[in-house]
Every structure is written in structure tokens, then in C-alpha cells.
């Protein structure tokens, strides 16, 4: 074997030896680092899967709670509409009864006014008839007829 003094070939051999030695000595060190990194990645994946599972369960629970809340809201809305309809109907009944009372009061007032007007007209008619009778009576009655009328009126009053 001859000694190779070619620097390029010699460096390649030296590099192969150095790389081999580095690989041999650092294999445990780099392997440990890589193994720890692999374990950390696996742990992170497991944590992510568990968080995904928890999030999925929470989402499912939230969706069921949302559905229950929507049903409750719908029931509350329906109850509110029913209550509003009842209140509206009650208000209409009260309005009708108040209107009937007002109409009855107005009818009573109208009847009272009509009765008052009738009485007033009767009184005026009676006064007019009396005035006319008093105006015509002295010319038609002489003293003897007047005495007879007075006597018959007194007898009627005594019998009554």
C-alpha cells in the first residue's frame, strides 16, 4: 500500500471517518433527542384528540341545550300570544260592557229629557187651554150659568 498524498482523497476518507465516529457517538444523543421529540409530538396529538373529543361533547351538549332553550322560548312565545289574546278578549268584553253602560245612560238621559219636554209641553198646552178658556168663558157664561158651574164644582170637590 502506498501512501496517498492527494489532499482531496485524503480529506474524503477523513470526513467519512469523522462522520462515522460522530454518528457512532452521537447516535445515542441524537436518538434520545429525536425519541423525546417523537414522544412530545405523540403526547401533543393525544392531547389534541382529547381536546377534540371534549369539544365535540361540549358542542353536542350545547346543541341539545340550544334545542331545549328554543323549545322553551317557543312555548313562552305561544303562552305570551295566548295571554295577549285573552287580555285582548277581556279588554273587548270590558269595552263592550262600558259602551253598553254608556248607551244605557244616554238612553236614560234621552228618556228623561223626553219626559221633561213632554211635561213642559203638557204644562204649556194646559196653560194655553186655560188662558183660552178664561178668555172665552166670561163671554159665554152668564151669572146664573157661572153660579151653577161653581156649585157643581163644589159638590164634586166635596164628594171627592
From Swiss-Prot:
User: What cellular component GO annotations does this protein have?
Assistant: plasma membrane-derived thylakoid membrane; proton-transporting ATP synthase complex
TM stretches of this protein: 15-35
User: From the record, what ranges are coiled-coil?
Assistant: none
- Domain of life, per UniProt, equals Bacteria
Which cysteines bridge via disulfide bonds? none
Q: Where in the cell is it found?
A: Cellular thylakoid membrane
Q: How does it sit in the membrane?
A: Single-pass membrane protein
Instruction: Print the keywords alphabetically.
Output: ATP synthesis, CF(0), Hydrogen ion transport, Ion transport, Membrane, Thylakoid, Transmembrane, Transmembrane helix, Transport
Q: Which GO terms describe its molecular function?
A: proton-transporting ATP synthase activity, rotational mechanism
Q: Which PANTHER family match?
A: ATP SYNTHASE SUBUNIT B, CHLOROPLASTIC
User: Its family?
Assistant: Belongs to the ATPase B chain family.
* Complexes and interactors: F-type ATPases have 2 components, F(1) - the catalytic core - and F(0) - the membrane proton channel. F(1) has five subunits: alpha(3), beta(3), gamma(1), delta(1), epsilon(1). F(0) has four main subunits: a(1), b(1), b'(1) and c(10-14). The alpha and beta chains form an alternating ring which encloses part of the gamma chain. F(1) is attached to F(0) by a central stalk formed by the gamma and epsilon chains, while a peripheral stalk is formed by the delta, b and b' chains.
The protein's job, in short, is:
F(1)F(0) ATP synthase produces ATP from ADP in the presence of a proton or sodium gradient. F-type ATPases consist of two structural domains, F(1) containing the extramembraneous catalytic core and F(0) containing the membrane proton channel, linked together by a central stalk and a peripheral stalk. During catalysis, ATP synthesis in the catalytic domain of F(1) is coupled via a rotary mechanism of the central stalk subunits to proton translocation.
Protein name (record): ATP synthase subunit b
Q: Which organism is it from?
A: Synechococcus sp. (strain CC9605)
- Gene encoding this polypeptide? atpF
Amino acid at each position: 500500500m502506498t501512501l496517498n498524498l492527494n489532499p482531496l482523497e485524503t480529506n474524503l476518507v477523513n470526513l467519512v471517518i469523522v462522520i462515522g465516529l460522530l454518528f457512532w457517538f452521537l447516535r445515542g444523543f441524537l436518538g434520545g433527542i429525536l425519541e423525546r421529540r417523537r414522544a412530545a409530538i405523540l403526547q401533543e396529538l393525544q392531547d389534541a384528540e382529547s381536546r377534540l373529543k371534549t369539544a365535540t361533547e361540549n358542542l353536542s351538549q350545547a346543541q341539545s341545550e340550544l334545542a331545549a332553550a328554543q323549545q322553551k322560548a317557543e312555548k313562552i312565545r305561544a303562552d305570551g300570544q295566548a295571554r295577549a289574546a285573552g287580555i285582548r278578549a277581556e279588554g273587548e268584553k270590558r269595552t263592550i260592557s262600558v259602551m253598553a253602560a254608556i248607551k244605557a245612560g244616554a238612553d236614560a238621559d234621552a228618556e228623561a229629557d223626553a219626559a221633561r219636554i213632554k211635561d213642559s209641553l203638557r204644562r204649556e198646552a194646559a196653560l194655553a187651554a186655560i188662558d183660552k178658556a178664561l178668555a172665552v168663558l166670561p163671554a159665554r157664561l152668564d151669572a146664573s150659568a157661572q153660579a151653577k158651574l161653581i156649585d157643581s164644582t163644589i159638590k164634586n170637590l166635596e164628594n171627592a
